Every structure is written in C-alpha cells, then in structure tokens.
Design a protein with these regions (language model features):
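An amphipathic, aromatic/His-enriched active-site/gating alpha helix that lines ligand/cofactor pockets
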Residues: 24-38, 54-88
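Short, well-ordered beta-strand segments in beta-rich or mixed alpha/beta enzyme
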Residues: 2-9, 38-65
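N-terminal first-folded block
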Residues: 2-32, 37
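Short phosphate-engaging motifs
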Residues: 14, 47, 69
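Short hydrophobic/aromatic patches at helix-to-coil boundaries
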Residues: 90-94
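Structural signal for conserved beta-strand scaffold positions within catalytic alpha/beta enzyme cores
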Residues: 43, 88-89
Length: 94
C-alpha cells in the first residue's frame, strides 16, 4: 500500500469553490479507481487543506494520475489555488 498526503494552498476567498471542486473529484476517484482505498479532503481549524490518499500499489497510483477525471479536474481548480501542492508519499507500515 502507498499513502499520499497532498497539502493544498487554496487562494483566499476561494475555499467554498475549492471544496466543491475537490469533493467532486473525490467522488470520481472513489467511483472509478478500484485500487484507491482512500481519497479524503480534510481541513484544520486554521483553514489548511490536505487530501489523504491510499492506493493498493504502484499501478493504482499511476492509474490515478492518468485517469481522465484527474486530468480533467485541472480546469476546475484554475484560479482557486494560491500555489502548487506539496505532495508527500509514504509507505504503509503493517
């Protein structure tokens, strides 16, 4: 299993639009990627966002990046981000 934590820099005032777009993407990931076990948007008390992801294997992670819904989602996030995401990849222990 492969874990991914994506820290997202959302533009001020764009939080509601971002959440709508990200939740739509998350629904597509869960519906269309059998190798994905978790794709969840989280927000802390300060308004910082992360997406927590869990994939069965390398093939599932690669399929996510190549999926049509993931590629198409870029247009949904245009103008909503304050900067690039920080992606941290981790191995699942146990």
């Amino acid at each position: 299993m492969i874990g991914v934590v994506a820290t997202l820099n959302v533009a001020a005032g764009k939080e509601a639009e971002f959440e709508t777009a990200m939740l739509a993407l998350a629904a597509q990931v869960r519906a269309n990627e059998p190798g994905n076990h978790l794709y969840t948007l989280c927000k802390d008390d300060e308004g910082n966002y992360v997406v927590m992801e869990l994939y069965e294997n390398e093939e599932a992670l690669a399929a996510h990046g190549q999926s049509e819904h993931f590629k198409a989602s870029g247009a949904s996030f245009k103008g909503l981000m304050a900067g690039p995401p920080s992606i941290k990849r981790m191995a699942v222990v146990g």
